[in-house]
Swiss-Prot record:
GO terms for biological process: thiamine biosynthetic process; thiamine diphosphate biosynthetic process. This is Phosphomethylpyrimidine synthase. Its cofactor is [4Fe-4S] cluster. One of its GO terms (cellular component) is cytosol. It comes from Neisseria gonorrhoeae (strain ATCC 700825 / FA 1090).
Length: 633
């Protein structure tokens, strides 16, 4: 893979940076010994991507053993397809347009509906930053509901649902029937804590997806204005997903750097991406990201609304926020974090906390409530928000504005009061057939993590849980990807559907591309550990394949099968860089004489030899008896 070139920090040269966006900007991905494969759906335009990792043969004294390719879930979109044409200035292909047209329940608007969107589209000062391939937005026709939840409740299986089902199943049903995969598919029994996890790959069907969405246990974030999207599903009874954050700030980062970070996140496996920009050119940055994103994009609309007031929370209004929702919905944002559960009466509950209110959105709304001594306008206007969401199929990510910011504040009165209100709002959103997931903490000591999952399932009616970690200790700035990864693996096992990554820069600064890489790999690891623990069918296949490669000293296959092949190989080559070391039966940890796996293989060879000798002696004994057992003839 070619590493993205480094972009400058904000320098006033955004136009020059954008003019440097070549056709593939140096970010086309090349995975080691891998092949992009498409699984065909029931119609020609349902082509679901996955990646197959090819393995080397195993050579033994008995001959050659072929090792089969290992399929892995692939979020890289066109960037991971060698045959795809990539031009960030044009955006990705519109794979969902035909699906949207066929349903006949949307209309192409003559122009943008948002006042701010219209203003930005005609502002000469931002012309040099504007994405030039903007199409007119879609909206539901009058009286129509275009959400995946609405279709599911009507018994309709959409192409998005079929796509997501094939993506989750990932041809495992075929592998379970092939003898060469039999040993590799052995798996420990999982503990799913009452979840309805499929026990066989053939149970992961479009109808199963429809049922889970209809029940509110899963969502497919898929705005009708994001036709570039490759649909995916978030739910307790599916693979655990991860979200990667990006976004500029008033201090650092540029538009092109955020676009590059988005694509970089896809390379390492982000399932969704949240644009949390709070700096300059939020509207333009978001447009570039969405038009080039094959995964769902989420935002926190209150951030941009605050920017429109010059950063003065007291000046926020419902009308300004409403316009922001429409602006972002017409750009194609797939899910909104809405902090509607921060109620006026809950704010005093945080007074005795060690770290108070740490959510940016939560603190903004708390300040507005106190300044006006009025109820949170996101709560009082919630039905109107639902009307906007269902017109574009934007999913709710109901924000935890009162999440704990340290383990001392975990699971307190204010946190759970807000969670219970989020349950109330979930029920209200479902009455509009709007898809919902619930955001969770935060900072929680390990022994209290499960309580968060139990509370969410009970009070939010099994809507998908989406958590930031949680961090299980507060003593490791610079290593919070690890402190949070521990909590993430646990809460993912208990039932959380999506994990929001944490990078090493958490609490310290804005992450760069390498921090993003580390955060995503850490969270892919946590999500995979959770899939193993809850018993997702086929989850252990990659582990078993890598373990077999390790025992057989197939170093290249160990690298290829790992979550970060480049780093694994670089660590190996720091001490054994020679090409011959890639076939050596030892590494630098133990050396050639003390490698446990080499010794084990020698013991096996010796045992096989002894067994052969015993078998030969036994055969001679039988032959002796058959000949009359005479010593002398």
């Amino acid at each position: 893979m070619t590493t993205p070139k480094k972009t400058a920090k904000i320098s006033g040269n955004e136009a020059r940076e954008l003019s440097d966006l070549s056709e593939d900007i140096g970010i086309r991905f090349k995975y080691q010994n891998s092949e992009r494969v498409y699984l065909q759906g029931s119609r020609d335009d349902i082509r679901v991507p996955l990646r197959e990792i090819r393995q080397d043969d195993t050579y033994t004294a008995q001959g050659t053993e072929a090792n089969p390719p290992i399929p892995v879930y692939d979020t890289s979109g066109a960037y991971g397809d060698p045959a795809a044409h990539i031009d960030l200035k044009q955006g990705l292909p519109h794979i969902r347009t035909a699906w949207l047209d066929e349903r006949g329940d949307t209309e192409i608007l003559p122009k943008l509906s948002s006042e701010y969107g219209i203003e930005r589209a005609h502002d000469p000062k931002t012309a040099h930053l504007r994405f030039n391939q903007i199409t007119r937005p879609r909206r539901a026709k009058a009286g129509r509901n275009v959400t995946q939840l609405h279709y599911a409740r009507q018994g309709i299986i959409t192409p998005e649902m079929e796509f997501a089902a094939i993506r989750e199943r990932m041809k495992l049903d075929e592998l379970f029937r092939r003898p060469e995969y039999a040993k590799l598919l052995k798996q420990h029994t999982g503990q799913s804590f009452g979840a309805n996890i499929p026990t066989r790959p053939d149970q992961i069907t479009p109808e199963f997806v429809r049922q889970e969405i209809a029940a509110g246990r899963a969502i497919i974030p898929a705005n009708i204005n994001h036709p570039e999207l490759e649909p995916m599903i978030i739910g307790r009874n599916f693979r655990v997903k991860i979200n990667g954050n990006l976004g500029n700030s008033a201090v650092t980062s540029s538009l092109t750097e955020e676009v590059e970070k988005m694509v970089w996140s896809l390379r390492w496996g982000a399932d969704t991406i949240m644009d949390l920009s709070t700096g300059a050119h939020i509207h333009e940055t978001r447009e570039w990201i969405i038009r080039n994103a094959p995964v769902p994009i989420g935002t926190v609309p209150i951030y941009q609304t605050l920017e429109k007031t010059g950063g003065i929370a007291e000046d926020l209004t419902w009308d300004l926020f409403r316009d922001t929702l429409i602006e972002q919905a017409e750009q194609g944002v797939d899910y909104f974090t809405i902090h509607a559960g921060v109620l006026l009466r809950y704010v005093p509950m945080t007074a005795n906390r060690l770290t108070g209110i740490v959510s940016r959105g939560g603190s903004i709304m708390a300040k507005w409530c106190l300044a006006h001594h009025r109820e949170n306008f996101l709560y009082t206007h919630f039905d109107e928000i639902c009307e906007i969401m269902k017109a574009y199929d934007v999913s709710f990510s109901l924000g935890d504005g009162l999440r704990p910011g340290c383990i001392a504040d975990a699971n307190d009165e204010s946190q759970f009061a807000e969670l219970h209100t989020l349950g109330e709002l979930t029920d209200k959103a479902w009455k509009h057939d709007v898809q919902v997931m619930i955001e969770g903490p935060g900072h929680v000591p390990l022994q209290r993590v499960k309580e968060n999952m139990t509370e969410e399932l009970q009070h939010c009616f099994e809507a998908p849980f989406y958590t930031l970690g949680p961090l299980v200790t507060d003593i490791a700035p610079g290593y919070d990807h690890i402190t949070s990864g521990i909590g993430a693996a646990n809460i993912g096992w208990y039932g959380t559907a999506m994990l929001c990554y944490v990078t090493p820069k958490e609490h310290l600064g804005l992450p760069d591309k390498e921090d993003v890489r580390t955060g995503i790999i850490t969270y892919k690891l946590a999500a995979h550990a959770a899939d193993l623990a809850k018993g997702w069918p086929g989850a252990q296949l990659r582990d078993n394949a890598l373990s077999k490669a390790r025992f057989e000293f197939r170093w290249r296959d160990q690298f290829r099968l790992s979550l970060d092949p480049e780093r694994a190989e670089s660590f190996h080559d720091e001490t054994l860089p020679a090409e011959g070391a890639k076939i050596a039966h030892f590494c630098s940890m133990c050396g050639p004489k003390f490698c446990s796996m080499k010794i084990t293989q020698e013991v096996r060879d010796y045992a096989d030899k002894q067994k052969a000798q015993r078998q030969g002696m036994e055969e001679k004994a039988v032959e002796f008896v058959k000949k009359g057992a005479k010593i002398y003839s």
